């Protein structure tokens, strides 16, 4: 069954109509999005978080893969896929400064103050017993100096704790648990240089920077907290590989059981991240594949007079977002730009349930936000009160508002420049009620 959820878009973008430039205001998020995965038996609750720095894709891609492909059998895992969504979409460490240095004291006037309060509230939730925070760090940590790449000042491939023990707290044996995590990871190293080590920052001894971090805030509030660092020297798939190993190691240490639907190898992770079956549904009436899109899609329907953060996005993935950029709206998948949408602002009509289309001689019913596979040709059947525009097809004497129904359309009749994909195989069927946009159906020639 396809997993769907609504994504928050973290920019306010007010469209005043196609004839005017839209007003845009970009601001920090006010709260985090939490996805709770619950098992069937009582066991601890792990709070798993990634993406506090927007330019560390290993963390938020790991949480995304975890949410899509892991099942919790006993215990609970609460997942924040990305803490700093705006910075992620811009591929920036932190637009308003380092979000992971705002947990000790923060001026209430700081743009990210509400977001920090939301994260703090989640950390101190009585149901949470243990916390893991995912980062991508430089080089490879070593307790003693080995080289410029392997030394105590590096962070990559390490398990971070603030102190050895947290007395009187469940799972307070931080060093012991961290050693359990690193022992688990080190059983499955891709190369010896990737070896994991425990790094104790001894924060309470006066590390002023680490005192401002999320994990130390958790420690001060009697929560066992760990950070996992994957090296920035590694590919994205390798970073996610080590993050997932660390997550599995911690779950085993605290008694959370799980299954997953793939073999934990970098090649498998690469395929999951770059899955050609990933899709996005916008406004409940537009469907797009994530991969293979043209670099730009022009005259793309958007509801006018609607803030962009009120546009619903549904996907199997949890790290999608829309990013306004001048007169375009960029579709982002984590840090990756999937396409640039050139918006056409329209009134939206919600009345259309489906439309009949003859595909290769057989009539089928298609709902908005669906895709049909075509071998030879298709023909849209008339529907009272609606008109149809097939993007890339020109009807003779069609006028400015064509109604391209009752016409058999073969692949050769379509202008490939107007396909949505680079291969020239997928085309938009747009349905209108008067001037209002009612929905889009895609046809893919196979």
Predicted regions and their residues:
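Sec-dependent N-terminal signal peptides
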Residues: 4-12
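Structured catalytic-domain cores with a bias toward divalent-metal coordination
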Residues: 2, 16-446
